[in-house]
């Protein structure tokens, strides 16, 4: 059973969306055992008796996982519970060797909280319901004639971040999830690698008529390992539900949409039914008898709160207020901690923050996109980009030449731009004003109509003249000098 994506929607309806974000914490060991918490190793090598649920094995709580959960709670201004406990969530599946998951049901470690995200250029607040600790399941792998289970992931520490049903569009859902990801990376709680499963997102979606109170039956969607797939899946499901209600205007709501779990098939671009939705009763929650409650002191929580690093929103506001970056530039830089850190490092030797931002967000990504790389993955030192911008600022090279130098920097990542410029005669600036004047005179002699148009107030005509001069001198002349000479000579023409 599947549902093809098509464009929604109906103006009388609104979506109600809640997200459950599962985050694998980057602790050295697992949540309840000393087994390594590491992705990509040979199957079933990072396991102990606790991971595989052997009789007599007992869990021991990883205190670093608790600390990271508290860090996140403090980062979103939530209430960190001084008393929380673990529970067993029972279900039967091959990747769960104990036939239950250790999670937190009614007394989670974090309650409430607020996440501020940028949606269409504006800040919007989203409410978090809870954050709880739990251990991960193993991985079921299907082969041609059999299925195998890799328990390396079993027991890895997770926090599940549950939002309130306060999200109403796919764009809001993506913005909220990206803000969560950025916070987690800034506090070093997780690498949030969606391809490796460090960040997994489930969405709960229902629709209702605008102004209607209460919630209708919801659909859960799993298997969204990118933000673009997530946005597509949500759009698809919103449209499906609206069409279902419009097609059956007289039927009771709960007979039109039944609670169920779907998965997103990225190849077919459609949602596929997995199973009818279970209720909390189906999981038979009860307190975990082998673990004592988590009891935290005020001083422990406050110490973690005071040790928080600068968070994405704080850094974004600093970039706009102190550096004069646009809101878009600041958001784009701070959404990726590695990129923001790279920017900060380059700023130590670069005088122009706006120019640096433009090169990091536009010029270099455009050159690296085809190879799926970025400035860090090709080992391009921050000081080299700073050096390139400084060469432009000093007038040593023009912006056009800088782009050619950037091409060589990408091709030879370890080479300093000053060295590249010094070794190529074509990159030497044209400082002879008399020679530049000859180019200007030639362009003016060949483009009388552009002179007439410029005098008539058409700025594009002047830009064309500048471009022609720069073309003749192969981009080596100073644009400001070319501008000055053109204006002087045009003013003196009869």
UniProtKB/Swiss-Prot annotation:
It comes from the Bacteria. It comes from Protochlamydia amoebophila (strain UWE25). One of its GO terms (biological process) is translation. Keywords: ATP-binding, Ligase, Nucleotide-binding, Protein biosynthesis. SMART domains: GatB_Yqey. Belongs to the GatB/GatE family. GatB subfamily. GO terms for molecular function: asparaginyl-tRNA synthase (glutamine-hydrolyzing) activity; ATP binding; glutaminyl-tRNA synthase (glutamine-hydrolyzing) activity. This is Aspartyl/glutamyl-tRNA(Asn/Gln) amidotransferase subunit B. Gene3D superfamilies: 1.10.10.410, GatB domain, N-terminal subdomain. It is an enzyme of class 6 (ligase). PROSITE patterns: GATB (PS01234).
């Amino acid at each position: 059973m599947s549902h093809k994506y098509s464009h929604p929607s109906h103006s009388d309806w609104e979506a109600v969306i809640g997200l459950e974000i599962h985050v694998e914490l980057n602790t050295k060991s697992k949540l309840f055992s000393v087994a390594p918490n590491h992705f990509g190793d040979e199957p079933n090598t990072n396991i102990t008796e606790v991971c595989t649920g052997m009789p007599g094995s007992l869990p021991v709580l990883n205190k670093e996982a608790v600390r990271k959960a508290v860090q996140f709670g403090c980062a979103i201004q939530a209430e960190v519970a001084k008393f929380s406990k673990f529970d067993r969530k029972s279900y039967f599946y091959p990747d769960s060797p104990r036939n239950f998951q250790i999670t937190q049901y009614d007394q989670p470690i974090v309650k409430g909280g607020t996440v501020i995200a940028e949606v269409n250029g504006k800040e919007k607040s989203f409410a978090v319901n809870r954050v709880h600790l739990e251990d991960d399941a193993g991985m079921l792998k299907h082969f041609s004639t059999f299925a195998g289970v890799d328990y390396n992931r079993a027991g890895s520490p997770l926090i599940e971040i549950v939002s309130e049903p306060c999200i109403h569009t796919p764009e809001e859902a993506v913005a909220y999830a990206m803000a969560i990801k950025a916070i987690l990376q800034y506090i070093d709680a997780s690498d949030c690698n969606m391809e490796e499963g460090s960040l997994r997102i489930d969405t709960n979606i229902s629709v209702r008529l605008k102004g209607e109170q209460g919630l209708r039956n919801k659909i859960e969607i799993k298997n969204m390992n990118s933000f673009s797939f997530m946005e597509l899946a949500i759009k698809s499901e919103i449209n499906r539900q609206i069409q279902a209600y419009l097609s059956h205007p007289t039927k009771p709501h709960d007979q039109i949409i039944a609670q169920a779990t779907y998965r997103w098939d990225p190849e077919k671009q459609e949602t596929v039914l997995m199973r009818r939705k279970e209720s909390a009763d189906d999981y038979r929650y009860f307190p975990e008898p082998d673990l004592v409650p988590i009891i935290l002191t005020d001083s422990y929580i406050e110490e973690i709160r005071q040790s928080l690093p600068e968070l994405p929103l704080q850094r974004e506001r600093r970039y706009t207020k102190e550096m004069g970056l646009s809101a878009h530039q600041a958001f784009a830089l701070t959404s990726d901690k590695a990129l923001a850190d790279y920017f900060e490092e380059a700023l130590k030797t670069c005088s122009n923050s706006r120019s640096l931002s433009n090169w990091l967000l536009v010029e270099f990504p455009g050159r690296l996109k085809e190879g799926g790389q970025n400035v860090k993955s090709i080992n391009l030192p921050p000081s080299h980009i700073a050096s390139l911008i400084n060469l432009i600022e000093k007038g040593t090279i023009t912006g056009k030449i800088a782009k050619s130098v950037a091409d060589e920097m990408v091709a030879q990542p370890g080479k300093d731009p000053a060295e590249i410029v010094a070794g190529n005669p074509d990159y030497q600036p044209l400082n002879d004003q008399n020679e530049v004047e000859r180019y200007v005179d030639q362009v003016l002699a060949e483009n009388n109509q552009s002179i007439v148009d410029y005098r008539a107030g058409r700025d594009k005509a002047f830009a064309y003249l500048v471009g022609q001069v720069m073309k003749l001198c192969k981009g080596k002349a100073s644009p400001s000098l070319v501008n000055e000479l053109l204006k002087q000579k045009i003013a003196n023409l009869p």
